[in-house]
Design a protein with these regions (language model features):
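Mg2+/Mn2+-dependent nuclease catalytic core
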Residues: 74-98
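Short connector loops at helix/strand junctions that flank enzyme active sites
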Residues: 51-55, 62-66, 97-99
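Short, electropositive alpha-helical surface patch
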Residues: 118-138
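Acidic-basic catalytic patches of nuclease active cores, encompassing PD-(D/E)XK
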Residues: 1-49
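Electrostatic, structured charged patches in enzyme active sites and in nucleic-acid/phosphate-binding
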Residues: 26, 112, 130
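Conserved catalytic cores of phosphodiester-cleaving nucleases, focusing on short active-site segments
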Residues: 58-76
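Nucleic-acid nuclease catalytic cores
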Residues: 93-123
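Charged phosphate-binding loop/patch that engages nucleotide di/tri-phosphates or the phosphate backbone
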Residues: 140-172
Length: 172
């Protein structure tokens, strides 16, 4: 039986689909995106791995534009902001300040829907939470134009949403 790490097959449904999508993008020379992995074999030897938390799930470039993103799953139509950590928000903010594009890919299981959440909207939800507001956001609060559909065998085809994100930035 195939195993991953030491506890059976691990990894989320969304991450598996994103990995397959990224492999397709790489083979088509559209976007070299790679998962950010921790060296689990040596972490008990090198204490430094415990000193700094992991940042995000994926980093790379889409036709020369630096991108970083995290893949998240949500069982209901309410996404808890506790699923995103402060150090991830900070990393994404710094990445955006260097003219990169940061975002979340979210799979809403209850709706069987994939969504692209631009960093600017994530930051808006995060600030609302910090100011005492809701510690989650609802699916209905997201722009339906950022829904991701399957395209030509690509499971989580998010390149169109990156393009839309770029166009909205240019219009500001």
């Amino acid at each position: 039986m195939a195993t991953w790490n030491s506890r059976g097959l691990r990894g989320s449904f969304l991450e598996e689909l994103v990995n397959m999508t990224n492999d397709k993008y790489r083979s088509q020379k559209l976007a070299p995106i790679t998962p950010v992995r921790m060296d689990k074999e040596h972490r008990q030897i090198t204490l430094a791995y415990f000193d700094q938390r992991s940042t995000i799930d994926y980093i790379g470039a889409v036709q020369g534009i630096p991108v970083c993103f995290d893949a998240k799953e949500c069982a209901t139509d309410r996404f808890p902001l506790a699923n995103v950590h402060e150090h991830q928000i900070r990393f994404m903010k710094e990445f955006e300040e260097q003219d990169g594009i940061a975002f979340l890919l979210i799979y809403f299981k209850a709706k069987d829907t994939f969504m692209y959440l631009p960093y600017a909207k994530l930051d808006e939800f995060w600030r609302r939470m910090e100011e005492g507001g809701a510690k989650h956001f609802k699916y209905e609060e997201l722009d339906p134009a950022y829904e991701i559909s399957t395209y030509s065998g690509t499971f989580v085809h998010y390149l169109e949403q990156i393009q839309m994100d770029l166009e909205q930035r240019d219009s500001r």
